[in-house]
Design a protein with these regions (language model features):
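Eukaryote-biased, non-catalytic alpha-solenoid scaffold regions
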Residues: 1-441
Length: 441
């Protein structure tokens, strides 16, 4: 028969190059220990350049990050690399350029060591600015270089003017205006920050910066008392990414801008379910927070698929918490259930807006909770496992205590007797029910 040795050969190659590199790193460190700085430095340079090439071409080592495969003491390697570099390269300009190159090639993991290597501020700044210019199409690298330059200044000139520093960088990339605005904000110069952001928000080249700039704009508008402008941006962000946290922020701004009712009316068409679990959970949280209990119940009770029981569980907690917290109850399991809801700190529930409810509405919401429990119990029974039967029994106990609180224990007795009858051939289920709830009748 045909035997494929290809995978074994690949594994042998992987083990061989890893062992070889680990050995060469040990040898380079040994040379440094015996005072052969020049030999150690050039060996480490070649090893790191080779590994860096592998990060740029994954076919070279058949792995995206070959550094992760090796196990030398990287702190010791970087300490030795930059200390020997400082001994070998005497010209401060050349030293700064080489140090920056190596810092980039180590995937920015040698910041502590590269900072110890620098000794001349003008040459360091010149080298970093040159690299920022050369990496014009790599914003992430440019920004890390800026952060390194800032760290250098914190050590060499702690009282430096960060605004002046950032203004040197905006000519290389307009994205740096966001950092400039951030700096103004840290100085409580809200007007300057606002004008800076407005001048650049439509010219940003990195996707993550757009949202960052918009959030900073909202903050600036708020600080300047321009709530309608802050609300307009926040609403636009919320419409794109309908998270619960964004909803709350936008709602607060709507109230401050005196457009809350218009906002609540505008979002009603958005409160619909889809196939997106995260979006659906956010819809449930909003409905729970606002007290849209009928809609909450409708969504949960009509949900199918893998997440249906999760939605029902959330809606159940919301309905019970709205009606019964913080009432004193004689039903101990129900009381514990409410305690666990509070401990769990479910968003949209523990922070919900509370309203005065008539007794009829309270009773209706608890009856809706019972209907959800019936669905949840059947879901657990259909799981056909001992642990799902145990969960079904616990949910049955909660239902019993809700009926008891409502003064409708006879309705639970009817349901419970029928449950036993329908599931007469499920001894494990009946055992769990008897243990938690008791015998029917």
């Amino acid at each position: 028969g045909y035997i494929d040795f290809g995978e074994d050969k690949e594994n042998e190659f992987e083990i061989e190059w890893v062992n070889t590199f680990n050995y060469f790193f040990k040898v380079a460190l040994m040379y440094a220990k015996i005072g052969e700085a020049d030999t150690a430095y050039h060996a480490l340079i070649r090893l790191i350049k080779c590994l860096y090439s592998g990060t740029q071409d994954s076919k070279m080592f058949d792995i995206e990050d070959p550094f992760q495969m090796l196990n030398p003491n990287w702190d010791q390697v970087y300490d030795t690399l930059f200390s020997t570099m400082k001994q070998v390269i005497k010209d401060s300009n050349q030293l700064s350029l080489q140090a920056i190159d190596m810092w980039i090639m180590t995937n920015f993991k040698s910041t502590e060591q590269v900072l110890m290597c620098f000794n001349d501020l003008p040459s360091i700044e010149s080298a970093i600015l040159l690299n920022i210019e050369e990496h014009e199409y790599h914003w992430s690298t440019q920004h890390k270089l800026y952060q390194l330059l800032k760290d250098v200044y914190k050590i060499a000139a702690p009282s430096f003017d960060e605004v002046a520093l950032i203004k040197k960088l905006v000519r290389f990339n307009s994205n740096f205006y966001v950092d400039l605005a951030t700096c103004y904000m840290s100085r409580y110069q809200w007007k300057e920050a606002l004008n800076t952001l407005l001048s650049v928000v439509s010219h940003l080249t990195h996707p993550s910066l757009n949202e960052e700039a918009e959030l900073k704009l909202i903050q600036c508008y708020q600080k300047l008392g321009m709530y309608k402008d802050a609300f307009d941006i926040s609403k636009a962000i919320f419409l794109q990414d309908q998270t619960y946290s964004l909803y709350l922020k936008t709602r607060i701004l709507a109230a401050k801008a005196d457009v809350l009712q218009e906002f609540l009316a505008d979002i009603q068409p958005l409160l619909t379910f889809s196939n997106d679990r995260n979006r659906n959970m956010n819809i449930l949280r909003i409905c729970s927070y606002e007290g849209y209990c009928d809609r909450l119940y409708y969504f949960a009770s009509n949900s199918k698929g893998a997440y249906g029981n999760e939605y029902r569980n959330y809606a159940l907690k919301s309905l019970i918490y709205r009606v019964l917290f913080p009432k004193s109850l004689q039903q101990m399991n129900l009381l514990l259930f409410i305690h666990f809801i509070k401990e769990d700190a479910s968003l949209g529930i523990i922070d919900m807006r509370k309203y005065v409810l008539t007794q009829d509405i309270q009773d209706k919401l608890l009856l809706d909770a019972i209907e959800l429990l019936k669905q949840m119990i059947q879901y657990q029974i259909d799981g056909h496992k001992r642990h799902t039967y145990e969960q079904a029994a616990y949910e049955c106990l909660l239902m019993k205590e809700i009926y008891e609180y409502l003064g409708m224990s006879d309705q639970f007795d009817t349901y419970y007797s029928q449950l036993f009858k329908v599931n007469s051939r499920r001894p494990l289920l009946k055992e769990a029910l008897r243990k938690h709830v008791g015998y029917p009748g």
